[in-house]
């Protein structure tokens, strides 16, 4: 017993030390979130020129909370993962308050409340309700059986997931297939590349053909882009990128399997191969069809009825869609056998993280979008000049790369909104005379969300599930090496061919 106690003492000291570091980090984060507020107040005379909330007169300082929010998402999980895990919701709220406080002081509480309600009702709630519905429905579909992870099977699963991603969302398709894929390959030593290409294809590229596929495209749908517009205009770029990636994956997986693992796979298998055992929770396929129908309904049904909520016009079709999606979510939870969700290790942590972080993003992005709508008259005139030529015409290739690179390191949903508005923000114009520009923005946001773990919400969710199953996933920068070697050359060719 004394020896055991002695062994525990260093751990106890370490725990005290770690707790001190944790509290120090918490204090630093609180102070960091106050910096933009202090800067905004310090620049009060400059901000005073924007009392009417005119995008052409707003100072770029109003974009600091948005920048801080996105930098927190990028940096905190790397430098303080434990702190981030416990406090990401508080950090998101702090950045939102860092904007709303000065905003209410200068523009008035009424306008601050109106902008907050608009951000929540017009964009955030529809966005998170759809994601939650897809996540819940997909989490209730359990594929039974342990297949043998050969290159042919793995490629087939990736191809299937790529197609499903535009129907049930990248989140839904990823959550449906990642666990069967990991079980099929748990007898192999080299599995990292399987998960990396799964993120490339299923969690990102595959979601480019419909508003259901990826959050940026759903935001575009909310802005007025028709449901099947992306299906028509992104089909060729998507087929090209996914075809090249599937061929590259098959070649790499064949090398690992036949040269290094074929013998091992015969003798070591934690989950012995078995035939396809059927699907539990089949009722969720009905719910999935209902989700698709509801989104289509909200885009096609125009009753010209709206409700005024603190100045925000909530269209009847959108209210019906969101309430019905909540109903579908509850029905899925009530009717799915518990065993099916248990077999999928279903839990709410991933969607809770997305909900808390995007609440802060949608609040802090309000002044940024207002300034971008001002075009050359606003604070971001330099960005306008980068993506447009001297005569004001868009450089489509620059829209593709600018949207894509920012989507890689920030988040592709708000980045899409930024460049959508930078291109004019009018869906009807962009779908017609500006079709190539809108296609470049859409492809950049969806495709290049695969460049990093933080580019798209499902990326981190897939990484976490793989790590929980014992896969030694690459670090942030190691994953960046994978995407730099595989995706960057492919995107250079894609931009040259299509934009």
Question: Which residues fall in each region the model found?
Answer:
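Juxtamembrane and boundary regions of transmembrane helices in multi-pass small-molecule transporters
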Residues: 209-210, 229-273, 447-499
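N-terminal secretory/membrane targeting signals
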Residues: 21-50
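Hydrophobic mid-bilayer segments of alpha-helices in multi-pass membrane transport proteins
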Residues: 62-73, 87-103, 124-133, 159, ...
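Transmembrane alpha-helix boundary signature
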Residues: 47-49, 81-82, 100-120, 132-149, ...
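Core mid-bundle transmembrane helix pairs that form the ion/substrate translocation pathway
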Residues: 230-335, 495-497
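Interfacial loop-to-helix junctions that mark the boundaries of transmembrane helices
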Residues: 51-62, 83-91, 113-125, 227-237, ...
């Amino acid at each position: 017993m004394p020896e055991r106690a002695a062994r525990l003492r260093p751990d106890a000291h370490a725990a005290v030390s770690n707790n001190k570091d944790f509290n120090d980090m918490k204090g630093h984060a609180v102070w960091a979130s106050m910096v933009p507020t202090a800067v905004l107040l310090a620049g009060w005379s400059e901000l005073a020129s924007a009392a009417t909330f005119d995008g052409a007169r707003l100072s770029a300082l109003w974009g600091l909370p948005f920048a801080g929010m996105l930098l927190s998402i990028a940096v905190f999980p790397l430098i303080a993962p434990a702190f981030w895990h416990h406090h990401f919701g508080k950090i998101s709220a702090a950045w939102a308050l860092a904007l709303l406080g000065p905003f209410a002081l200068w523009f008035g509480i009424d306008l601050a409340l109106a902008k907050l309600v608009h951000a929540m009702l017009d964009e955030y709630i529809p966005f998170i309700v759809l994601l939650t519905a897809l996540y819940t429905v997909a989490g209730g579909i359990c594929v039974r059986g342990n297949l043998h992870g050969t290159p042919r099977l793995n490629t087939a699963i990736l191809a299937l997931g790529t197609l499903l991603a535009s129907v049930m969302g990248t989140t839904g398709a990823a959550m449906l297939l990642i666990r069967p894929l990991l079980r099929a390959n748990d007898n192999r030593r080299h599995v990292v590349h399987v998960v990396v290409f799964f993120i490339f294809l299923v969690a990102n590229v595959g979601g480019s053909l419909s508003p259901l596929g990826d959050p940026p495209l759903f935001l575009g749908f909310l802005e007025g882009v028709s449901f099947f517009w992306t299906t028509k205009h992104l089909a060729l770029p998507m087929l090209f990128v996914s075809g090249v990636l599937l061929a590259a994956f098959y070649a790499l997986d064949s090398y690992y399997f036949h040269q290094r693992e074929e013998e091992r796979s015969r003798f070591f298998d934690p989950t012995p191969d078995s035939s396809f055992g059927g699907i539990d929770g089949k009722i969720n396929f009905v719910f999935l069809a209902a989700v698709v129908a509801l989104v289509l309904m909200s885009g096609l049904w125009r009753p010209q009825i709206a409700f005024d909520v603190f100045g925000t016009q909530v269209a009847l079709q959108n209210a019906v869609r969101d309430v019905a999606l909540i109903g579908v979510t509850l029905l899925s939870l009530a009717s799915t056998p518990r065993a099916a969700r248990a077999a999928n290790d279903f839990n709410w942590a991933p969607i809770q993280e997305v909900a808390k972080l995007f609440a802060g993003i949608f609040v802090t992005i309000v002044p940024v979008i207002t300034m971008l709508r001002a075009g050359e008259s606003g604070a971001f005139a330099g960005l306008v000049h980068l993506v447009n030529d001297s005569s004001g015409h868009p450089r489509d290739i620059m829209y593709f790369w600018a949207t894509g690179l920012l989507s890689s390191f920030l988040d592709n949903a708000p980045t899409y909104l930024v460049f959508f508005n930078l291109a004019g923000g009018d869906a009807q114009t962009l779908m017609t005379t500006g079709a190539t520009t809108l296609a470049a923005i859409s492809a950049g946001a969806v495709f290049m969300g695969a460049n990093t773990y933080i580019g798209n919400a499902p990326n981190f969710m897939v990484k976490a599930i793989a790590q929980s199953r014992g896969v030694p996933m690459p670090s942030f920068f190691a994953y960046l090496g994978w995407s730099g070697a595989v995706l960057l050359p492919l995107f250079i060719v894609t931009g040259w061919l299509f934009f």
